[in-house]
Amino acid sequence: MSRRKTREPKEENVLGPTVREGEFVFGVAHIFASFNDTFIHVTDLSGRETLVRITGGMKVKADRDESSPYAAMLAAQDVAQRCKELGITALHIKLRATGGNKTKTPGPGAQSALRALARSGMKIGRIEDVTPVPTDSTRRKGGRRGRRL
């Protein structure tokens, strides 16, 4: 009779950097909140390497709900879970609205995405607004007399 082959214990591959206990590993969460969708894009500190990118539209079925706070919250929870798998424990936040010659106000998903990241156990470092501001832009849409309601 042949003996059963026993599996040899494999070394566990740990994703992410090796750190001491109680030390934070930072990533950068770029949150782009327009009025049509909310993007949460986590990179390393240099911004070159994408670790995870999830949008509100990936979490809900209806197009009208892509920019909703609920979709942003679901996306942020997914992002936080993936970050923890990769060993990221803290995030710097870069919040961006559409900007340019369009609105400089972040969309409805911005605040709920930030809250969901904080509530899911991620430590928040710096919060920065990186909305592009025109120095002297092309002409804004709406015509000479502006948008009439």
UniProtKB/Swiss-Prot annotation:
Signal peptide: none annotated. InterPro entries: Ribosomal_uS11, Ribosomal_uS11_CS, Ribosomal_uS11_sf. Transmembrane segments: none annotated. PROSITE patterns: RIBOSOMAL_S11 (PS00054). Pfam families: Ribosomal_S11 (PF00411). SUPFAM superfamilies: Translational machinery components. One of its GO terms (cellular component) is cytosolic small ribosomal subunit. One of its GO terms (molecular function) is structural constituent of ribosome. Residues 140-149 have a biased composition (Basic residues). Residues 130-149 are annotated as: Disordered. Keywords: Ribonucleoprotein, Ribosomal protein. One of its GO terms (biological process) is ribosomal small subunit assembly. NCBIfam families: PRK09607.1 (NF007176). Belongs to the universal ribosomal protein uS11 family. This is Small ribosomal subunit protein uS11z. The lineage of its organism: Eukaryota, Viridiplantae, Streptophyta, Embryophyta, Tracheophyta.
